[in-house]
Amino acid sequence: MAPLSLPESLSLIAAPMVNQSDLPFRLLTRKHGATLAYTQMLSPERLVYDREYLQFHLRDLEGSSSACCSDLGRPVVVQLCGNDPDEIVRGARLVEGLCDGIGSLYI
């Protein structure tokens, strides 16, 4: 993944909210001035082992790059939260091509 090139002004970053920061919410925050949006905290273990969970979040991220959303859907940073560094890396690899950055929280 290439380094993220951010706008000079990051005064309005849409912080993540659990179960709220999906594509429609991120689009609204971008429409109202946010220069960067985050996904909600995603479980890397569920991305790796739960096909339905993975497909839902892949569709959400693919929507960020679609023709209808490309000007508002990006940049987007995916957040991963887990307690197994190997699982965090596996989860990151599943989404890395659909986002502009990945943040992780090791708990």
Language model features with spans:
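Glycine-rich, positively charged N-terminal anion/phosphate-binding segment
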Residues: 2-8, 17-98
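Non-cysteine beta-strand/loop elements that form the S-adenosyl-L-methionine
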Residues: 39, 103-107
